[in-house]
Amino acid sequence: MRVRIALQVAAASLMVGTCFAAAGAAEAAVALAPHRAVYDLKLLKSHGKRSIEAVRGRILYDFTGSACEGYALQFRQVSEIDSGEGKVALSDLRAATWEDGDAKSFRFNSENKVNERAVETVDGSAGRDGSGVSVKLSKPQPKNFDLDAKIVFPTEHVRRVIEAAEAGKSLLELSVFDGSESGDKVFSTLAVIGNVIAPGEKLPDDAAAGNATLAALKRWPVTISYFEQGAAKTGEQTPAYSIGFELYENGISRALSLDYGDFIVSGTMSKLELKDAAACK
């Protein structure tokens, strides 16, 4: 199973402007809120070729920083997947990233274990200049490669989604590099943005409920589909996975829906802690 969230909700998922790569950090129009959130996972639906009996798990999402000092993310997703007939797999994905406020530098490190055995470790960095993006991997194997200048990093991605939502747009297509999986993949993404949910409408029933800061903010239902670049195109493309959530204008996400194709997992925000943002000097 591909157990992951694009570091938008977050990455991602959870996190998901004009081009912030060219804007000064102090001029960034979207202010992302430092916060720590916990999401409880459970199986919502199972269909297709792979039958999943149950999914239990949790996501810990710890986002800190500012446009001036850069953004850091500590992410952990632990999932127990029961495929029936006594076959249970425990997946433990840990990731740490840092992205500067101008979206010119990005560092990433992740480790994925299945049944306590490491199956994937990635470590690397990416830097943007006028001509493109250069990536240096130290794990899983040393490797250097270049990417198109149009690709965006995870925090920049969420800022672009929020900016598009604020502008009343319903679709946003971007190529995203988040250092996930083998560390060398770029995903073509399509964000579908629903109608704005104004403060006081459709009150949340999770940890966001009663939070005075969030109660005063707009939010949007968003679904982001991730397509592997370079995959064979035969008719209508099927996304590698999709992430649905409600996105607040400060970057906090709730009501997650992780669609892996053969099954869908829901993520309910069970804890939320807002942190103070450091003032730009």
Q: For each predicted feature, which ranges?
A:
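N-terminal signal peptide c-region/cleavage motif recognized by signal peptidases
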Residues: 19-23
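Mature, soluble, non-transmembrane domains
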Residues: 109-281
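Beta-strand elements of well-folded, non-transmembrane domains
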Residues: 41-45, 61-67, 79-83, 97-101, ...
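Short, surface-exposed coil-to-beta transition loops
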Residues: 54-59, 90-94, 118-122, 238-242
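N-terminal cleavable signal peptides for secretion/export
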Residues: 24-70, 74-85
